[in-house]
């Protein structure tokens, strides 16, 4: 399986690691790293430690974070995106919910992938249609996330998965109707977006099989999430090893991509998962 993303064709027969570069002061990264998380020094380390894709965001999606305007978001992103485009060979992904920021980054040629992470102020169908046409015209990759929460309702895992499938089926069909190449699309079940901590843990292992019938690769974004903290009883700054353990499980269950803060540990997880899968067959 291959992922067509603007100037790159990413071979997903080998599971891939998307590294998170948050250029924002209130993200999970901001107090967990040995250097300033928003610095190019940090980005260089991510690339050297095994990142296949660099996912850059300037607005935190963690619980309790402060929303930012698209103008502030673009101001934060400008220099990191220029640096990434000129200093790394990795495909560049934009992590954003703002329509104006997504259109700006595509029009400037800064990014290869749009990682659309959430609800914005625009009407959903209108906003997503504009994004999908812009992605189509740029030949960019697209990550479709099930970012709708479940309204505080505690659902069984089966009902949780059903809601995720319905959300992603709708977004996938809308993207295809707007001309996006299916080979450019990856699906994300939206771990940590109001689905319940127990369900989040189960999604790490079971989302790839639950979404397989949609015919797109699956990305698992579990890094430093509350579900891991609850499971192992550790604070967020101690969650990189549990994240890597979960990455190995996700890879072995069919995930094509994991999105993580520390790619080096998930690189080991990938090696173990590939070896175990090979010997199991």
Where do the protein language model's features map onto the residues?
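N-terminal carbohydrate-binding accessory modules
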Residues: 1-12
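Active-site-adjacent loop and "lid" segments of alpha/beta metabolic enzymes
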Residues: 5, 28-38, 42-45, 61-83, ...
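N-terminal glycine-rich anion-binding loops that anchor highly charged ligand groups
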Residues: 11-19, 23, 45-58
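N-terminal binding-site loop/beta-alpha segment at the start of enzyme catalytic domains
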Residues: 10, 16-39
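Catalytic PLP-binding core of fold-type I/II PLP enzymes
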Residues: 21, 86-96
């Amino acid at each position: 399986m291959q992922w067509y993303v603007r100037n790159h064709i990413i071979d997903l027969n080998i599971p891939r690691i998307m590294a998170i570069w948050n250029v924002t002061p209130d993200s999970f990264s901001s107090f967990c790293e040995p250097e300033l998380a928003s610095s190019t020094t940090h980005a260089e380390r991510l690339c050297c430690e095994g990142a296949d894709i660099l996912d850059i965001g300037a607005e935190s999606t963690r619980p309790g974070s402060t929303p930012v305007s698209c103008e502030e978001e673009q101001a934060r992103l400008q220099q990191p995106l220029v640096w990434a485009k000129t200093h790394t060979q990795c495909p560049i992904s934009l992590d954003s919910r703002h329509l104006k920021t997504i259109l700006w980054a595509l029009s400037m040629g800064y990014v290869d992938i749009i990682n659309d992470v959430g609800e914005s102020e625009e009407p959903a169908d209108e906003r997503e249609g504009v994004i999908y046409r812009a992605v189509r015209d740029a030949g960019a990759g697209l990550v479709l996330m099930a970012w709708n929460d479940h309204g505080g309702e505690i659902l069984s895992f089966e009902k949780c998965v059903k809601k995720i499938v319905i959300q992603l089926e709708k977004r996938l069909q809308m993207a295809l109707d707007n001309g996006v190449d299916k080979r450019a699309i990856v699906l994300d079940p939206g771990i940590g977006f109001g689905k319940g901590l127990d369900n989040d843990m189960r999604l790490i292992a079971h989302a790839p099989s639950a979404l397989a019938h949609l015919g797109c690769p699956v990305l698992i974004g579990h890094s430093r999430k509350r579900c891991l903290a609850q499971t192992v009883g550790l604070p967020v700054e101690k969650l990189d090893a549990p994240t890597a353990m979960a990455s190995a499980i996700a890879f072995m269950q069919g995930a094509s991509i994991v999105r993580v803060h520390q790619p080096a540990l998930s690189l080991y997880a990938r090696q173990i998962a590939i070896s175990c899968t090979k010997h199991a067959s």
